[in-house]
């Protein structure tokens, strides 16, 4: 259908179909106004497309967290430092709180706190559990074993997204989780056979850290989505409250002053390395929080998991430790799980699709009772 009008200049304007569908409505928001602001520190990624944002965040995660992993393992090579994993966590929390406060102070636009304090009380507790237990586990485990456990973070994240956010996942997600669990089990068995530092208590510590980590990702995603909180706010309150928690605990247990005494003997190897360790970790957290905000917790976990696989390889290069070929095979199974998880984001495969496919295969393999109609006709003709 076409309708023609003449304007004041005498020229004819033709609208094809309904006029309302061809002319933009008045006061319609421009595409730029609909965009949600995405910033990492002072870098504005709002006007980049989704793929570019994802690739930039991935590059940042790999560079910063590879440095983070290297500095973390380097600190624990200092003789006598292994019992002070919780003190390292305290120093790390202090640095993170200062970094977050400085970043927030330099912002031109001050924004009041968005997320309720009771949510931050929970986040601080989970953050303390994640980082404290993870740092402490290095006193009992080989570094690659600790990292391979972290690679399987997707498993508790998957469970947490179902329980906390009520999300539904397809069969590929669960298959990825199974592959990761299998690879993790084989890697742990291999490490227990060749590593002189293997201790089952370390497995317990890192497992508890993963449970806290899974809850953090989902609670953060839900809170940031509902309250539109900036990254630095989440960091300041999560780590600031966590610092208070840990300070009180270490003061009551008497470990605070012993940690200070030891670190003052080696200030460069402890406080100095911890500064680089914390700075790279802080910047990495900003990028991971942006990934959580834009892509969701499971995909963010997949990116950080892939980075950890590279960290394991570099750990064997920079730090001497026993190696067995079983590390490689079990690690490849974990990588397969990572790939399946990434592929599941593109695939629309559901359990209903699998059920229909299984039914079709069953019909082809198992003949129907009484035979088909064509078979009956052939028998009658004979």
Swiss-Prot record:
Biased composition, class Polar residues, residue ranges: 1-10
GO molecular function: 3'-phosphoadenosine 5'-phosphosulfate transmembrane transporter activity
Entry-linked Pfam families: UAA (PF08449)
Superkingdom of source: Eukaryota
Main subcellular localisation: Golgi
Cell location: Golgi apparatus membrane
Function: Mediates the transport of adenosine 3'-phospho 5'-phosphosulfate (PAPS), from cytosol into Golgi. PAPS is a universal sulfuryl donor for sulfation events that take place in the Golgi. Essential for viability. Involved in glycosaminoglycan synthesis and the subsequent signaling. May be involved in hh and dpp signaling by controlling the sulfation of heparan sulfate (HS).
Keyword match Cytoplasm: no
Gene Ontology BP annotations: 3'-phosphoadenosine 5'-phosphosulfate transport
UniProt gene name: Papst2
The name this protein goes by in its record: Adenosine 3'-phospho 5'-phosphosulfate transporter 2
Protein topology in the membrane: Multi-pass membrane protein
Record-annotated membrane-spanning stretches: 56-76, 83-103, 121-141, 144-164, 170-190, 197-217, 234-254, 271-291, 299-319, 323-343
Protein keywords: Developmental protein, Golgi apparatus, Membrane, Transmembrane, Transmembrane helix, Transport
Region annotation (Disordered) ranges: 1-33
Database matches in PANTHER family: ADENOSINE 3'-PHOSPHO 5'-PHOSPHOSULFATE TRANSPORTER 2, SOLUTE CARRIER FAMILY 35 MEMBER B
GO cellular component, one term: Golgi apparatus
Record-stated family: Belongs to the nucleotide-sugar transporter family. SLC35B subfamily.
């Amino acid at each position: 259908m076409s309708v023609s009008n003449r304007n004041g200049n005498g020229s004819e304007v033709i609208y094809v179909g309904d006029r309302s569908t061809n002319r933009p409505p008045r006061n319609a928001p421009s595409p730029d106004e609909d965009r949600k602001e995405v910033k990492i520190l002072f870098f504005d990624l709002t006007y980049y497309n989704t793929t570019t944002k994802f690739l930039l965040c991935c590059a940042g995660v790999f560079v910063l967290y590879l440095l983070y992993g290297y500095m973390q393992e380097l600190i624990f090579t200092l003789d006598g430092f292994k019992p002070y994993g919780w003190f390292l966590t305290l120093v790390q929390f202090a640095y993170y709180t200062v970094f977050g406060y400085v970043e927030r102070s330099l912002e031109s636009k001050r924004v009041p706190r968005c997320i309720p304090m009771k949510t931050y009380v929970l986040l601080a507790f989970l953050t303390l559990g994640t980082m404290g237990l993870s740092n402490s586990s290095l006193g009992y485990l080989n570094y690659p074993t600790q990292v391979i456990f972290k690679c399987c973070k997707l498993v508790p994240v998957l469970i947490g997204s179902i329980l906390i956010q009520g999300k539904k996942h397809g069969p590929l997600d669960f298959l990825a989780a199974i592959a990761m669990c299998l690879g993790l089990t084989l890697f742990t068995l291999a490490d227990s056979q060749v590593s002189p530092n293997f201790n089952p208590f370390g497995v317990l510590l890192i497992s508890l850290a993963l449970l806290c980590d899974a809850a953090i990702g989902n609670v953060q995603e839900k809170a940031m989505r509902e309250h539109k909180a900036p990254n630095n706010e989440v960091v300041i309150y999560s780590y600031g409250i966590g610092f208070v928690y840990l300070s009180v605990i270490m003061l009551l247990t008497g470990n605070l002053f012993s940690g200070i005494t030891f670190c003052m003997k080696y200030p460069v190897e402890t406080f100095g390395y911890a500064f680089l360790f914390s700075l790279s970790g802080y910047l990495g957290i900003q990028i991971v929080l942006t990934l959580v905000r834009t892509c969701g917790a499971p995909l963010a976990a997949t990116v950080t998991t892939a980075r950890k696989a590279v960290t394991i390889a570099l750990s064997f290069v920079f730090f001497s430790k026993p190696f067995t070929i079983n590390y490689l095979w079990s690690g490849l199974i974990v990588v397969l799980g990572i790939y399946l998880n990434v592929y599941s984001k593109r695939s629309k495969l559901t359990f209903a699709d699998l059920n229909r496919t299984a039914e079709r295969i069953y019909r082809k393999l198992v003949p129907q009772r009484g035979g088909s109609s064509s078979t009956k006709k052939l028998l009658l003709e004979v």
